[in-house]
Structures are given as structure tokens and as C-alpha cells.
């Protein structure tokens, strides 16, 4: 569960939208792009599919999905932050490609899509920021077709005490100072508290099964600093 109210989370991401992509590259040394490609692969999206990128942010996963589903498929990028959706739309226009993505603003707690609608879905760095994780998982399960997969990528607190210490030093001495240089220190200080409140891998699996998914498996990435929850409706 997010440690901030929904409007506060929306305001936070609206604030960091202009620097979001550059700072993500800097803070992850570009590795977030590799992890996102892995998430798209785990989603099992294929040409011609109708797919959802929930909490799409500036659109990285949506662009990757659009390349997979091709001109006969459909991608919806869905987010609460209008500022990030504007960044995503600007990026799409700059690419000037044949990729067609429908950007929609709304609430992940109440998705405006019919049941059994999507062939696959992704959710990158968003589940940690929602106010009610079980409700979002139930909504995601509802809109996926039976047998469809979703891949949910996010940061995690690792189980290892040594790695937890490393993560804390990384956040305190690298992430927040780098954000401070962009006048966004307060926004990135929020990451620490959000990680403390975020369920770890096996807890996420249990939540997914309780939400109605038939199968769920959590994969650790980067020694447990990141992870992907793969679920099947």
C-alpha cells in the first residue's frame, strides 16, 4: 500500500515528469530498460494482441509492447498522472513511427474496461505506489482474458540484510542527491518509505492468488533489489 494519499502520489509524479526518464537512466545505470524488456517477454504479448500497460508513466513499456503487437494489435497506456501521459504522448510524436498507442488517464482502482478484455498486460513501477494493492490486482485480473498474463515489475526490499544495507546507502547517497540536483529530493525521498510498506515477493504471490489469478510466480532481479511478479488470469 502506498504511504501517500492518491492525490499526493499523483502530484509527486506530476512534479517529476519532466526529468523522469533521464533520472531513471542515471539512477539505474540504464538497467531499467533491460528489466522492462524482460517484463514484456514475461507478459507473453504477441502480434495482434490487445494489451494494457497499467501505470504506464512516460511510456517505456507501452512502446515496447507496441513493437511486439504490431499494426494489427492495440496498446493502451493507462496512468493517473496527466503530466506523465503528456510526456509519453510527446515521446510518441517525436518517434514519428507507425506505433499506435492510446493514452488514457484514470484510476487503477476502477479500470474503465470490460471483463476479459486484454490478451496481456504490464505494470512497471506502479504497484508500489497505489493506495490499495489487492483492489488493483482484482481489477487487473478482471480485465484480462482467461489464461492471459501480466508482468508486474517493481523495486523491492531484498531479503538479505547486507543487500538491504547496500540499498539504503544507494538511496541515501546516490538517489536522493541525484534527485536534489534536479530540485526533486523530497519526491525521491518517498522511495524509502514506499519500499518499507511494499509486500515482498511471496507476499505478492499470495495477494495475486487471493485476487483471483490462477497462477502467480515472483522472479527476483538484481539480487532481489528488483522483481517481476508474473500472474495468469
From Swiss-Prot:
It is an enzyme of class 2 (transferase). GO terms for molecular function: 2-phytyl-1,4-naphthoquinone methyltransferase activity. Pfam families: Ubie_methyltran. The keyword DNA-binding does not apply. It comes from the Bacteria. Keywords: Methyltransferase, S-adenosyl-L-methionine, Transferase. GO terms for biological process: methylation; phylloquinone biosynthetic process. Pathway: Cofactor biosynthesis; phylloquinone biosynthesis. It catalyses: demethylphylloquinol + S-adenosyl-L-methionine = phylloquinol + S-adenosyl-L-homocysteine + H(+). Its EC number is 2.1.1.329. Methyltransferase required for the conversion of 2-phytyl-1,4-beta-naphthoquinol to phylloquinol. Belongs to the class I-like SAM-binding methyltransferase superfamily. MenG/UbiE family. This is 2-phytyl-1,4-naphtoquinone methyltransferase. It comes from Synechococcus elongatus (strain ATCC 33912 / PCC 7942 / FACHB-805). The lineage of its organism: Bacteria, Bacillati, Cyanobacteriota, Cyanophyceae, Synechococcales.
